[in-house]
Amino acid sequence: MKRAVVVFSGGQDSTTCLIQALHQYDEVHCVTFDYGQRHRAEIDVARELALKLGARAHKVLDVTLLNELAVSSLTRDSIPVPDYEPDADGIPNTFVPGRNILFLTLTAIYAYQVKAEAIITGVCETDFSGYPDCRDEFVKALNHAVDLGMAKEIRFETPLMWLDKAETWALADYWEKLELVRTETLTCYNGIKGDGCGQCAACNLRSNGLNHYLANKPAVMSAMKAKTGLK
């Protein structure tokens, strides 16, 4: 039996990954992390979606220690979430240091216990927003370290790594779940479900990608298929 574990936040990217995994694996588990994030509604959204989409199990892990260590606008109410700035340089204050290191490592421990062969994460280098822990080289390096530390091969899969946001929408549409992803996921840094606040970087990236996809469906769908190998 082919098993996979999805690192699941209830946002657009991880939900699209879950949808695809459910078509490609016999059994899919989800792991969501409570790290004291600013908008805890995402945990409730993740629970609802994991149940609705048919995950075999959904584990919510308490990692609130991360909140004490990682200072970010996503973990501190006192730090305002910035509006979208198209020419911004450097690492944004929405970056949570160590988050993906911790999430992927703990998910690997869970995957080891349930005998899953793969961990699926929705990180993306094309639209990585300045987050160093969304880069392909980081994921591959951590995957290698985890395999060595567990003396077991657990594959880290990143199906969105080379897709832009329009192509990620195309992937959701390919699996006939575009409307669900648009209306029922929570990607907004200000904690607003669906189309979000329309002001933060996450909402801007998401809406621009959707608009581009809807205006150029055949071309974007073709590009997505070429990158993913889907027919």
From Swiss-Prot:
Sorted UniProt keywords:
ATP-binding, Ligase, Metal-binding, Nucleotide-binding, Queuosine biosynthesis, Zinc
Cofactor stoichiometry and binding remark: Binds 1 zinc ion per subunit.
Q: Which residues bind Zn(2+)?
A: 188, 197, 200, 203
Query: Where does this protein act, in terms of pathway?
Result: Purine metabolism; 7-cyano-7-deazaguanine biosynthesis
- List cofactor names only: Zn(2+)
Record-level GO BP terms = queuosine biosynthetic process
Recorded catalytic activity of this chain's protein: 7-carboxy-7-deazaguanine + NH4(+) + ATP = 7-cyano-7-deazaguanine + ADP + phosphate + H2O + H(+)
Sequence positions that bind ATP: 8-18
A molecular function annotated in GO for this UniProt entry is:
ATP binding
* EC number annotated for this UniProt entry: 6.3.4.20
Top-level taxon in the UniProt lineage: Bacteria
Record flagged with keyword ATP-binding: yes
* Top-tier EC class: ligase
Q: Where are the transmembrane segments?
A: none
UniProt record similarity statement:
Belongs to the QueC family.
Q: Which function does this protein serve?
A: Catalyzes the ATP-dependent conversion of 7-carboxy-7-deazaguanine (CDG) to 7-cyano-7-deazaguanine (preQ(0)).
Name of the protein? 7-cyano-7-deazaguanine synthase
Q: Which organism is it from?
A: Enterobacter sp. (strain 638)
